[in-house]
Amino acid sequence: MSLNDSIKRGEYLVKTIGCHDCHSPKAMTERGPQLIAELALSGHQAGDSLPPMAPETIKNGWMLMNGQLTAFVGPWGVSFSANITSDDTGIGNWSMQRFKLAMREGKLKGDKNGRMMLPPMPWENFAKLNDEDLESMFKYLKSTKAINNAVPAPIPPTRLDSLKSA
């Protein structure tokens, strides 16, 4: 497969598998959430605040998302969607090997000694993709517009009280 065909296949996979669902900020409209094109695949935006929430909500079995659909709250704490653009704050300095390790083993940033990715990242599904598909996705993501956005670190469950409403 040519490089151009591989990038097109990667774009198709990224769009149909649902990467934009979590990794692209949305604006809420009368028709529901709409992707903010200029922030596509850049993850949860650095500096964005989270709305207040009652930690009891999580203790009672609920999970929540913020309005941009890039922050997720559950028993694991708060996780933020990663920047997967070609910028160095995204996957710009990743190798194919790191990408495959992240997708196949769920290792954060493809670091074999690092922690596991947090929910709702469905890496177990991506682990089933063949090499050609993962390579095409990686080539497409590396071809995207670089968006500088250092996504915040997750908030552990022990700090959910910091999100309480006033």
Q: Where are each of the predicted segments found?
A:
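Electrostatic cytochrome c docking/interface patches
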Residues: 1-15, 27-29, 33, 49-52, ...
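C-type cytochrome heme c attachment motif
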Residues: 12-24, 98-104, 135-139
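Flexible coil segments in periplasmic/lumen-exposed cytochrome c-class electron-transfer proteins
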Residues: 24-79, 96, 108-166
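Secondary-structure boundary elements
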Residues: 2, 16, 143-147
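Mid-length scaffold segments of soluble, non-membrane domains
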Residues: 77-94, 98
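Generic anion/oxyanion-binding catalytic loop in active/binding sites
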Residues: 8-11, 88, 123-126
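Active-site micro-motifs of SAM-dependent methyltransferase domains
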Residues: 21, 29, 86
